[in-house]
Swiss-Prot record:
The keyword Transit peptide does not apply. Pfam families: Ribosomal_L17 (PF01196). SUPFAM superfamilies: Prokaryotic ribosomal protein L17 (SSF64263). PANTHER family: LARGE RIBOSOMAL SUBUNIT PROTEIN BL17M, RIBOSOMAL PROTEIN L17. The keyword Methyltransferase does not apply. NCBIfam families: L17. One of its GO terms (cellular component) is cytosolic large ribosomal subunit. Part of the 50S ribosomal subunit. Contacts protein L32. This is Large ribosomal subunit protein bL17. Residues 136-189 are annotated as: Disordered. It comes from the Bacteria. It comes from Paenarthrobacter aurescens (strain TC1). InterPro entries: Ribosomal_bL17 (IPR000456), Ribosomal_bL17_CS (IPR047859), Ribosomal_bL17_sf (IPR036373). GO terms for molecular function: structural constituent of ribosome.
């Protein structure tokens, strides 16, 4: 007894399902974007990405393997020359699914599945490296801040014992400044 395919069934038998996925993939590679049901788009996504990965390898065995699944030589040629070159720097994520609402008639949820042919922006990689570096630098900066805060605290304790009246005068000035700022903040609202 054959093991059933995981995921939603597309109707018909296993052979019909394989042919339907192959035809959807061929249409996707030919037109770069197709409109289909959400279920078919979700089943097509890993299938198409696997074929694009074969195309990125570019060797004869990969081409023959894809030709075994998609019988249209023109589509396979386009996949291996145009699409594989466009996604050469991308590590997966070659397709994008966008839901577009329900179909008139049977109210089936529809989606657009398209190839992501835009080049990967190096800015995204730089941002990821910068955030990693910032997270490593943040604990070191906190340690420096703690050390600098401890030194003034020791000096402040010595100064407080000698200049207690001066500290009270500074505190009174700080309170007066806060009361002046509070009405200004309320005016801004």
């Amino acid at each position: 007894m054959p093991t059933p395919t995981k995921g939603p069934r597309l109707g018909g038998g296993p052979a019909h399902e394989r042919l339907m996925l192959a035809n959807l993939a061929a249409a996707l590679f030919e037109h770069k974007r197709i409109t289909t049901t959400v279920t078919k788009a979700k089943r097509l996504k890993p299938y198409a990405e696997r074929l694009v990965t074969f195309a990125k390898r570019g060797d004869l065995a990969s081409r023959r393997r894809v030709l075994g699944l998609i019988s249209d030589k023109g589509v396979v040629h386009e996949l291996f020359t145009d699409i594989a070159g466009a996604v050469a720097n991308r590590d997966g994520g070659y397709t994008r699914i966008t839901k577009i609402g329900n179909r008139k008639g049977d109210n089936a949820p529809m989606a657009v599945i398209e190839l992501v042919l835009e080049p990967v922006s190096p800015k995204q990689a730089v941002v990821a490296e910068a955030t990693a570096a910032a997270s490593k630098a943040a604990p070191a900066a906190e340690e420096e801040v703690v050390e600098t805060e401890e030194a003034p605290a020791v000096e402040a304790e010595a100064a407080e014992s000698e200049e207690a009246p001066a500290a009270e005068a500074e505190a009174a000035e700080a309170e007066a400044a806060e009361t002046e700022e509070a009405p200004a903040a309320e005016d801004k609202k």
